[in-house]
Amino acid sequence: MAVEEIASRKDISLRDMQISAILKMLFLNKDLNNNDNITTITDDIFNQQEIIWKVLILDIKSTATISSVLRVNDLLKAGITVHSLIKQDRSPLPDVPAIYFVSPTKENIDIIVNDLKSDKYSEFYINFTSSLPRNLLEDLAQQVSITGKSDKIKQVYDQYLDFIVTEPELFSLEISNAYLTLNDPKTTEEEITGLCANIADGLFNTVLTINSIPIIRAAKGGPAEIIAEKLGTKLRDFVINTNSSSTSTLQGNDSLERGVLIILDRNIDFASMFSHSWIYQCMVFDIFKLSRNTVTIPLESKENGTDNTTAKPLATKKYDIEPNDFFWMENSHLPFPEAAENVEAALNTYKEEAAEITRKTGVTNISDLDPNSNNDTVQIQEVVKKLPELTAKKNTIDTHMNIFAALLSQLESKSLDTFFEVEQDPGSTKTRSRFLDILKDGKTNNLEDKLRSFIVLYLTSTTGLPKDFVQNVENYFKENDYDINALKYVYKLREFMQLSNMSLQNKSLEDGSDSAFKPSNLTLSGIYGLTEGKLQGGVGSLISGIKKLLPEKKTIPITNVVDAIMDPLNSSQKNLETTDSYLYIDPKITRGSHTRKPKRQSYNKSLVFVVGGGNYLEYQNLQEWAHSQLHNPKKVMYGSTAITTPAEFLNEISRLGASNSSNNDA
């Protein structure tokens, strides 16, 4: 199956599409034939084709792209024996071909030409992460011709892979502080135009990897509209320059097959950036550092009495979430209590399998078995073959056990469950009273969490919060000498923001399926048993009534927009009225006006992009909607300029609040 065919299959994820494109490049841009699941593609190629051993040369950006989806063993199966950074001192390997996968910069081109001059490798296969500008292409051609060694350059390709994929349908352009840049009064028009062009370039890469030219819908009046226009122009030029009769990229005129790209500004839903989620993946991202599938957990922190949220830990422990991590795939989207219950079940299953092995082999511990043993007993040989898989399973379970233990420690020390609880009912008097009680808990290691919850209450309360309540909260933070510049921006945003998110109508995702939240009897005392004593002290009283913390599943603003655009027949009138005003661009219309008043039509596939920062809460809510039984299953890919932690986004709007204050003072 060719890579283009793989990319067109509905059941293939965005991550799979990127992997297939990378593997095609590693096999010197030859079409790959593979009929199995794409996760086994390297094994199949390794067995079916004669491997050409190669060197892979990367830069910082391309390293991030590859390391998010492939491991060293995968590279080895693709014939990569050595991989190095382009700026490192590299030993000459004159008998070995080299694949370059680097950003299209003048500096990288100069290094490649120097490698060519010195005959560092036998052949040069040059691949750029995104489109090489014409002036740099001409520069490369001129420099190569001067060397007289152009015969060594076998390929020059634009790969359109300049984006990071960390989950099956989640991607990031790795552009930090985009919201700050786009909303800071000090930012020049030239800087905004340049940033929007960079974002459009990143989306262009993603669209070409998906291998289908989508309809573009975008919110008007902000950066999303600018980016949509720029991207529409780039895609239209691409369509014009491509022979549609011979390129699968342009196949599929049916809207159900083509899909839709929905570009939104972050202001559509500010609260989701600060919400305390009860979903396992969201909690790991929020509480610890989850970056490119690596979880970084602080091992030591200062005593209670200081806010550790920004302090550097004395030591950290890192855990890799492998792309084939079975527990993460099955549980990352579940509420924390359910995931905790499942890790215990996984451990018990492993223990049963290990006990069966020891019974069959007669050893007391499976670690006593030698995988290289030549024991003639057929039964033992069969058991030994299972050892690597079983060992890997145990390592995965241990990883998540350790993560759960660390999460529990943070839950207890910061009373994080209380913030999740108050955010469920932002408008009630009881919630406000409860929040004031939380402020009096005597803890100062959770000041950031308190500020986040207040922002959520302020933005999501439909009638607004009483002035005396707001004043009490502000006084609390001032008494604790905590920076509340962020609130200045939040107040301004609430005052001036369009009511687009307020006019969107939520939809329940409860559908009677197994995916719906169920009441759980699992308390923290039960979860504590899973950690095998790694936590000190009793924590059973922390969330004894766990089922009250499992709210009804419902859509959030971004999902309401996607629902209205992808499934208009089943969407509310309120949501349809909001999205009807969105920009509509069809890049395939190359003559006349390419923008027109949109007609309501259904789509099975979408790419949803948020300008100014995204989060795992929106990703999970969209996936839950896509796979709910409210409609036929949909494919929804979600991305942003950057997947941003609450702490990082709080810092951005704090700087905006301070900047606006200084401008007002001036």
UniProtKB/Swiss-Prot annotation:
UniProtKB keywords: Cytoplasm, Membrane, Protein transport, Repeat, Transport
Any single GO molecular-function term of the entry would be: syntaxin binding
What result is annotated for mutating residue 532 to K? In SLY1-20 mutant
Keyword presence, Protein transport? yes
- Would I find Oxidoreductase among this entry's keywords? no
- Indicate the quaternary assembly: Interacts with SED5.
Q: What else is on record for this protein? A: Present with 5780 molecules/cell in log phase SD medium.
Q: Do you know which PANTHER family this protein is assigned to?
A: VESICLE PROTEIN SORTING-ASSOCIATED
Output this protein's name.
Protein SLY1
Please tell me the species this chain comes from.
Saccharomyces cerevisiae (strain ATCC 204508 / S288c)
